[in-house]
């Protein structure tokens, strides 16, 4: 198995940024904050007040800013439907998203838990059961976002693959293009749609 190096504090914040959050959100005084190194895509900080904990997420390069309102509304809606997920916090103006260090950020509630490197069969069952609850609950939400990882985006991904991939197998890129053509040609258009994770 391959280990991924986790360095998820790309953007460093300071006391001025913390003061901005205290001033613009109804959290109370922030007593402590520190970066969370576990993760790979965005910068995350654990923020502690006297009685509560929050997560500050600073969105980094790969995130499409236009998609963020969808995710804020999804988490908020799921939370209201009793799905255990982070709930985004609105600022005093009623807005979820704000800027820190010229990057979009948000605050969400903290969920207790710990990471698991291996799951038992029983734990896998519980995960599946909770994902099913998420799927059912999300049908009640009137939210839609085009799937940026579906078959329609695979051409773009394939075009980014350098011809050096042919070192793995002769004409691999060409055969991948042929396979993708067949997949797209036979892709069913009437599949059910819904929120997935």
Per-region residue spans from a language model:
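Asparagine-rich low-complexity intrinsically disordered tracts
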Residues: 1-5, 159, 178
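Juxta-kinase regulatory segment immediately upstream of eukaryotic protein kinase catalytic domains
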Residues: 2-29
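Generic structural marker for isolated residues within well-ordered, non-membrane alpha-helices
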Residues: 18, 75, 180
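Short Pro/Gly-enriched beta-strand edge/turn motifs at strand-loop
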Residues: 23-31, 176-186
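Protein kinase glycine-rich loop
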Residues: 34-38
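Active-site acidic catalytic loop and adjacent metal/ATP-binding pocket
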Residues: 40-50, 55-56, 88, 181-197
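ATP-binding pocket architecture of kinase catalytic cores
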Residues: 49-143
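A cross-family kinase active-site recognition segment
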Residues: 118-173, 191-193
């Amino acid at each position: 198995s391959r280990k991924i190096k986790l360095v998820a504090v790309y953007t460093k914040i300071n006391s001025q940024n913390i003061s901005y959050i205290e001033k613009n959100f109804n959290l109370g005084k922030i007593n402590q904050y520190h970066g969370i190194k576990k993760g790979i895509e965005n910068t995350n900080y654990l923020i502690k007040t006297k009685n509560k904990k929050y997560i500050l997420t600073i969105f980094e390069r790969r995130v499409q800013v236009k998609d963020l309102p969808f995710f804020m509304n999804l988490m908020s809606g799921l939370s209201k439907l009793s799905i255990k997920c982070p709930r985004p916090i609105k600022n005093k103006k009623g807005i979820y998203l704000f800027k820190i260090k010229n990057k979009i950020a948000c605050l969400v509630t903290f969920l207790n838990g710990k990471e698991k490197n291996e799951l038992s069969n029983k734990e896998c069952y519980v995960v599946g059961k909770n994902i099913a609850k998420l799927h059912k609950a999300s049908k009640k939400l009137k939210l839609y976002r085009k799937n940026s990882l579906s078959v329609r985006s695979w051409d773009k991904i394939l075009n980014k693959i350098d011809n050096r991939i042919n070192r793995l197998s002769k004409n691999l890129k060409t055969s991948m293009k042929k396979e993708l053509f067949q997949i797209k040609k036979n892709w069913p258009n009437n599949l059910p749609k819904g929120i997935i994770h």
